[in-house]
Amino acid sequence: MPAVLGFEGSANKIGVGVVRDGKVLANPRRTYVTPPGTGFLPGDTARHHRAVILDLLQEALTEAGLTSEDIDCIAYTKGPGMGAPLVSVAVVARTVAQLWNKPLLGVNHCIGHIEMGRLITGATNPTVLYVSGGNTQVIAYSEHRYRIFGETIDIAVGNCLDRFARVLKISNDPSPGYNIEQMAKRGKKLVELPYTVKGMDVSFSGILSFIEDVAQRMLATGECTPEDLCFSLQETVFAMLVEITERAMAHCGSQEALIVGGVGCNVRLQEMMETMCQERGARLFATDERFCIDNGAMIAQAGWEMFQAGHRTPLSESGITQRYRTDEVEVTWRD
């Protein structure tokens, strides 16, 4: 029964997880939170991760009831993500693997989300909507690859929401997306915003530029409230995501949809996806914030699958890749 330790730190979340044969034994996590109206810089984020990662490692082992001798493999996020945070975590993973004399595995962050979603929900072969601060992709499995059927052609949906939160000076604690979601529940007026879908691809830079341009004027003149803008932005960008997911499901003949990534925690997105799936006679699968937000257990789970399939990452190849495509990885652990 192999036990895999996973390190995740591709953005402002740092997590260490332990997975053994499909069971999550530990999954502690910390978040680097910045003041309202600001984002997080790579260097500052990396310094935060370095300051807490060893405490998280000890916390994970204690929670799992394991020692270093019980761990069979060390997995870490190879990419995609922000360079400095990725490097800070990869250095610790390499060091731990050498100190404990354990094999090392570099894991694709996106595949970590997918494998954790499959594990937690029991979805067998879903069309995946992967939505986060750094990625927006519609994915389906075929011939040992997670194939990207559609994606953003500019910025990720989570990045769009985060940057809008800065315009309104919305708090980053616990996350700007969560706070937008709560404000949107009180919105009553739908403001017409640009809607850009091109086949199975989407674009969010136009809607962000538009709402950045008009937000302060509309608020100053009383045309709408901040809550109305949050509501309108959510409804518009989520409708775009539902459309391209449904198109991919129709193309693949899929009867399952799985939402993964930090934006996947949004209840309104889940409701809209559920409506679409019901109309197609399909099933929707989603996880809660423990597993849809970046976490160490998802890297451990993907690492576990790779470890069982015989994958290993030599030290000479254990760097990071900021632009690590989902479809670059050969998925040898699935039929």
Swiss-Prot record:
Main location: cytoplasm
SUPFAM superfamilies per the UniProt record, alphabetical: Actin-like ATPase domain
Residues annotated for a divalent metal cation binding in this entry: 109, 113, 130, 294
Gene3D superfamilies: 3.30.420.40
Class of enzymatic activity (EC top level): transferase
Subcellular localization, as worded in the UniProt entry: Cytoplasm; Nucleus
Annotated keywords: Acyltransferase, Cytoplasm, Metal-binding, Nucleus, Transferase, tRNA processing
GO BP annotations listed: tRNA threonylcarbamoyladenosine modification
Coiled-coil portions: none
Cofactor details (free text): Binds 1 divalent metal cation per subunit.
Catalytic reaction list: L-threonylcarbamoyladenylate + adenosine(37) in tRNA = N(6)-L-threonylcarbamoyladenosine(37) in tRNA + AMP + H(+)
Entry GO MF terms: metal ion binding; N(6)-L-threonylcarbamoyladenine synthase activity
Subunit structure: Component of the EKC/KEOPS complex composed of at least GON7, TP53RK, TPRKB, OSGEP and LAGE3; the whole complex dimerizes.
Its job: Component of the EKC/KEOPS complex that is required for the formation of a threonylcarbamoyl group on adenosine at position 37 (t(6)A37) in tRNAs that read codons beginning with adenine. The complex is probably involved in the transfer of the threonylcarbamoyl moiety of threonylcarbamoyl-AMP (TC-AMP) to the N6 group of A37. OSGEP likely plays a direct catalytic role in this reaction, but requires other protein(s) of the complex to fulfill this activity.
Family (UniProt): Belongs to the KAE1 / TsaD family.
Protein name, per record: tRNA N6-adenosine threonylcarbamoyltransferase
Species this protein is from: Bos taurus (Bovine)
